[in-house]
Amino acid sequence: MIDPAIESHYGIGYERSRLFPGGRPTLEFVRSMELLDRLLPAPPARVLDAGGGPGTYAAPLARRGYQVHLVDPVGLHVEQARQAGSDPAAAFTAALGDARELSEPAESQDVVLLFGPLYHLTGAADRQRALAEARRVLRPGGRVLAMAVCRFASLLDGLYQGWLDDPAFRPLVDQDLIDGQHRNPDPVGRPEFFTTAYFHTPDGLLAEAEQAGFGGVCVYGVEGPGWPLRREWSDPHRREQILFAARAAETQPSLIGFSHHLIAAGVKA
């Protein structure tokens, strides 16, 4: 069901706290929630969070009044998600599942989130299966929001972190730029280099969503050009500047690729 390298990477358990270092939300989380708040229909819409991890987005959406069900192929994530979903103020359900073969009935969901499957499914055919399944379970007019990692994420991260001379990292960057196939040979020992994944170009993500039959597809840059400014993010004034830049750049074709993550939003006709 899941690549062993991916399972071992997430088996470390760090994903639950990754977007909240020191208890504070990161730019990635803040901007992703901002886009969800803007693009989702009003609660109590039904949301299927396919590949939803430990409930990072399911919990706040449930707290807003959405009816959320999460599926994920990693057992630890499902266990953590069930713990998060047991809070009466943010209740949601969670189960083991694969975005390529959803158990939900056809036309049963208002929203499908794919915040993980499109970058961990490294083959184009598998990504199309996940998108087709999302389309199948959506009602007419329902929305898909699919997250991707940008093709240039390792290049920019390596530049700002000083990793481009690291012999364990540079080959990853070179391969990412060739075909987007990201392979970290040590996903447990060097989790900061991520794990097995496919990194999209903005145009490639758009094309895949349209190929799956979604209409009105728009690709958004999530973090914008300011995501390397991690220390500045803790300063409220600088934080607002970073968010301003992200919002200004989110759909500009020449700037989308500076974001670490992309979100494609589309509608089932």
Question: Which residues are covered by each model-predicted region?
Answer:
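Conserved class I S-adenosyl-L-methionine
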Residues: 1-51, 56, 60, 80, 143-179
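Class I SAM-dependent methyltransferase SAM/SAH-binding core
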Residues: 56-101
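A short acidic, Gly/Pro-enriched loop at the edge of an enzyme's catalytic core
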Residues: 100-112
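Acceptor-substrate binding/catalytic loop of class I
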Residues: 121, 189-203
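A short glycine-rich, Lys/Arg-flanked "PGG" loop and its adjoining helix->strand segment in the class I
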Residues: 128-140
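C-terminal lobe and adjacent flexible extensions of AdoMet/dcAdoMet transferase-like proteins
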Residues: 208, 212-269
